[in-house]
Curated annotation (Swiss-Prot):
One GO molecular-function entry: zinc ion binding
Family the UniProt entry places it in: Belongs to the class-I aminoacyl-tRNA synthetase family. Glutamate--tRNA ligase type 1 subfamily.
Name this protein carries in UniProt: Glutamate--tRNA ligase
Co-factor remark: Binds 1 zinc ion per subunit.
Gene source species: Shewanella pealeana (strain ATCC 700345 / ANG-SQ1)
Binding site for ATP: 239
Annotated NCBIfam families: gltX_bact (TIGR00464)
Intervals of motif 'KMSKS' region: 236-240
Amino acid sequence: MTVKTRFAPSPTGFLHVGGARTALYSWLYARANQGEFVLRIEDTDLERSTPEACAAILEGMEWLNLNWDEGPYYQTKRFDRYNEIIAQMLEQGTAYKCYCSRERIETMREEQAAKGEQQKYDGCCRDKAPRDTDEPFVVRFKNPTEGSVVFDDHVRGRIEFANSTLDDLIIARTEGTPTYNFCVVVDDWDMGITCVVRGEDHINNTPRQINILKALGAPVPEYAHVSMILGDDGAKLSKRHGAVGVMQYRDDGYLPEALLNYLVRLGWSHGDQEVFSIDEMKQFFNLDDINKAASAFNTDKLIWLNQHYIKESDPEYVASHLEWHMADQNIDTSNGPKLSEVVSALSERAKTLKELAASSRYFFEDFAEFDETAAKKHLRGVALEPLTLFQTKLAGLNDWTLEAIHQAIEDTATELEVGMGKVGMPLRVAVTGAGMSPAVDLTIFLVGKARTEQRISKAIEFVANRINS
């Protein structure tokens, strides 16, 4: 049997990290078993579902490279199918029309609560014949009243619900639209889903859905209910913990591999290994290894992983993601070094692509002024001689190579009988405007000869003005 999983978000907001982790687990289980992964948009909540949210979900999935084999399917385009099944169930007696008013239902629940009883529908219309009237009605599933529903959850083990505790679920509203719990069942059946991976908040839906599947004569899939994600304070993850949409992590400068690596470890482990390539995730991932305890989100760990991926990934690949941030920060990269060369130069220290983009600005455009602290320390009178001598040597360079630039810096220090730092630091501030950069010879090489000459002239003028002021 081919393994077939699905990710079925509701388009009422962005794709958040909890949803992204569920999608990843479902995707990995399919890929690890040479199966298929389906994307389904559960948009039956017509009031809250929006095209913008749907677009955000698709964008997030594409950015994470969680490709799907089928879909996206939209529940709102399948209403005819749901209504067809509801009509069959009414005819077969596995569902019935309920004419109870909202007022009667509310009174019933109040009385049950007063007696300390479980609040559920009392079956008033369960065995009554349909009325030949225009009275409004809902359609309820005739849930079994005896026995129990048992399923073996990949994460939580054996779970059992007594049928006596389950309600006769509404499967069609008064206006005729099918309900979420019913649509899910029909979709999983029609799409051949063999394993449902979802959040633990769906556990109570599972016995109802299993009973409907059995009533339809449909196969029951396997289930894996993953725990929620907590903030680092132990509370449910929310916006105050920085719980944001997946694309916000893109905007903040994270690589998709870093976020995926972090999310896969947020509840799953393989020995003591922390860093996983996508291929390793596919190789080692197993639903049975997911921890049933809730996991706490740790931004510091995510940053550490992101820094690792920026440093260790192919510079060309990192540059392809960096392009977005350069454009976002209005940095024109058409007049400067190759972006992959900038990545190679700066990746050692960068924690995020956003940070890397900001720190690379001087490679592509001139700066208005020198950093005050760096200039005060390194653009003093003693810097005038090394700056002037190096500029002379720079003008005589015919081959613009890293080796030639390094030799010019070394020759300047030798002729002036000073340490390399006495030449390198004034040059660094002159060329970048700041006190930190990659190796000064590499920095000068990437900035280019013309820009370097202009900036050294600017620095010489700055030092001369300080001396004369």
